[in-house]
Amino acid sequence: HLLQFNKMIKFETGKNAIPFYAF
C-alpha cells in the first residue's frame, strides 16, 4: 500500500527509494 511504501522509502537511503517509488 502507499503508506507501507512510504515507510519503506524512508527506511531506504532515498537514492534507492526514488527509483522504487517511481516504479
From Swiss-Prot:
Per the UniProt entry, what are the Gene Ontology biological process annotations, in alphabetical order?
lipid catabolic process
> Can you quote a single GO CC term?
extracellular region
Q: What is its EC number?
A: 3.1.1.4
Concerning PTM, the database record says: Contains 7 disulfide bonds.
Q: In which tissues is it expressed?
A: Expressed by the venom gland.
The UniProt keywords, alphabetically, are: Calcium, Disulfide bond, Hydrolase, Lipid degradation, Lipid metabolism, Metal-binding, Neurotoxin, Presynaptic neurotoxin, Secreted, Toxin
Q: How is the cofactor bound?
A: Binds 1 Ca(2+) ion.
According to its UniProt record, where is this protein mainly located? secreted
Reaction catalysed by this enzyme = a 1,2-diacyl-sn-glycero-3-phosphocholine + H2O = a 1-acyl-sn-glycero-3-phosphocholine + a fatty acid + H(+)
Cofactor needs: Ca(2+)
Annotated localization: Secreted
What GO molecular function terms would the record report? metal ion binding; phospholipase A2 activity; toxin activity
Enzyme's top EC category: hydrolase
The protein's job, in short, is: Snake venom phospholipase A2 (PLA2) that shows presynaptic neurotoxicity. PLA2 catalyzes the calcium-dependent hydrolysis of the 2-acyl groups in 3-sn-phosphoglycerides.
What family, per the record? Belongs to the phospholipase A2 family. Group II subfamily.
Q: How is this protein named in the record? A: Phospholipase A2 crotoxin basic chain 3
Q: What is the originating organism of this protein? A: Crotalus durissus terrificus (South American rattlesnake)
